[in-house]
């Protein structure tokens, strides 16, 4: 248990190694077996110092506890920082490892053919091998990467994913349940629009241990958002950013590609009480209920409780729109019952509340809703506390009519 795990361990791989390329990129790999984990030694990085200086820190403050000049994700949540506990630390290590691999796949010019390299089950013959050679959608590949990483962690009993019809029972002894959307916004990849991974972590419910496997897997996955012990998202954009909360604030870490570390760049994020931005597809304005139309008309004329004209900013990528809202305030919303409570609404609402904001379905707090179905959908409004409260005061803001459009 005293052996340190180096984050720079690599293994041979068929991915991205083009013989004509003089400098093949070094890919990220999931560990292939359960690992005893302690935070790795700190590594020096120029970009780490640069990030600190851009945050307005002095040279002395940027030096931190060591000589490296930055705090990595694993340092920050380990025994010298938040001390989230050994089990959660190991789980987080495997989640961030998987997300680095997804980031590489999303950014790769070869991602349209990556499916044939992505089979993680070890099957080598017959129909299974034939299926493995067929390209898969990138969201399915991402789902397989995360499932493999969670299995290797040894810390997860159940994984429930937006990509699977039913939750997957992984390990009888795993202390955690993980719910996730492996690649939100995947339809945007061809246009290089930001995408993201969303995840939530619950404690396994030991009172269900004697139930049939399918039943206990489902019930463990249908916990209220109030029972989350951790949640986060990873934004794949011009930078790869992991934003997470462990019940003591919301913190964002940016991937330093020179070292492979997620570096703390936004500690203790606080969503402004009011913003000046709303994010919604307002081409659907005439499908909205009267209350939502009145709210949007009011704030963009500067006649709301915050006497400034609001601007519209809409990417049509939930993680990207929410990340901007976290930093600048305002509201990111989808007023129709489109987003999934378990995989998207609960984790993001948890992050919003930990940052001083709010998640709502237009009438009540998202985290107060008890899920009754695994793929349950609902409207979602995320953002500044006072903006959400003002929105709810308009009454009916949930879209009832879905005319059949996809986005």
Give residue ranges: language-model regions:
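N-terminal chloroplast transit peptides
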Residues: 1-30
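IMPase-like, lithium-sensitive Mg2+-dependent phosphomonoesterase catalytic core
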Residues: 40-113, 140-407
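Membrane-interface helix-loop junction between the first two transmembrane segments
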Residues: 108-125
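Short, surface-exposed loop/turn segments at secondary-structure junctions
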Residues: 117-118, 128-132, 185, 338
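N-terminal, Lys/Arg-enriched amphipathic/low-complexity engagement segments
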Residues: 120-133, 141-148
């Amino acid at each position: 248990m005293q052996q340190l795990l180096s984050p720079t361990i690599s293994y041979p791989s068929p991915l991205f190694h083009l013989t004509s390329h003089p400098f093949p990129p070094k890919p990220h790999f999931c560990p292939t077996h359960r690992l005893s984990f302690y935070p790795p030694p700190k590594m020096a990085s120029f970009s780490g110092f640069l990030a600190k200086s851009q945050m307005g820190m002095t040279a002395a403050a940027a030096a931190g506890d060591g000589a490296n000049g930055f705090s990595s994700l694993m340092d920050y949540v380990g025994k010298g920082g938040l001390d989230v506990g050994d089990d959660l630390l190991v789980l987080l290590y495997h989640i961030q490892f998987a997300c680095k691999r997804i980031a590489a796949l999303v950014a790769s010019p070869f991602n349209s053919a990556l499916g044939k390299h992505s089979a993680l089950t070890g099957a080598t013959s017959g129909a299974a091998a034939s299926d493995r050679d067929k390209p898969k959608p990138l969201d399915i590949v991402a789902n397989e990467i995360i499932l493999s990483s969670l299995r290797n962690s040894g810390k997860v009993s159940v994984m429930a994913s937006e990509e699977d019809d039913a939750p997957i029972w992984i390990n009888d002894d795993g202390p955690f349940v993980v719910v996730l959307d492996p690649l939100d916004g995947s339809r945007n990849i061809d246009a290089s629009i930001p995408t993201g991974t969303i995840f939530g972590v619950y404690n396994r419910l030991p009172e269900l241990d004697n139930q049939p496997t399918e039943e206990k897997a489902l019930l463990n996955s249908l916990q209220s958002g109030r029972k989350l012990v951790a949640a986060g998202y990873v934004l794949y954009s011009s930078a790869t950013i992991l934003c997470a909360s462990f019940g003591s604030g919301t913190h964002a870490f940016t991937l330093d590609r020179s070292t492979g570390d997620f570096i703390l760049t936004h500690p203790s994020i606080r969503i402004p009480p009011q913003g000046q931005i709303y994010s919604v597809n307002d081409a659907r304005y005439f499908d909205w209920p009267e209350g939502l139309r009145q709210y949007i008309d009011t704030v963009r004329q500067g006649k709301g409780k915050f006497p400034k004209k609001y601007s519209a900013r809409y990417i049509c990528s939930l993680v990207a729109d929410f990340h901007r809202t976290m930093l600048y305030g305002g509201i990111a919303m989808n007023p129709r019952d489109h987003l999934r409570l378990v995989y998207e609404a609960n984790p993001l609402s948890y992050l919003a509340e930990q940052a001083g904001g709010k998640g709502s379905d237009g009438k009540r707090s998202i985290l107060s809703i008890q899920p009754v179905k695994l793929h349950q959908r609902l409207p979602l409004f995320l953002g500044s506390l006072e903006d959400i409260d003002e929105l709810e005061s308009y009454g009916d803001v949930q879209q009832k009519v879905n005319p059949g459009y996809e986005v």
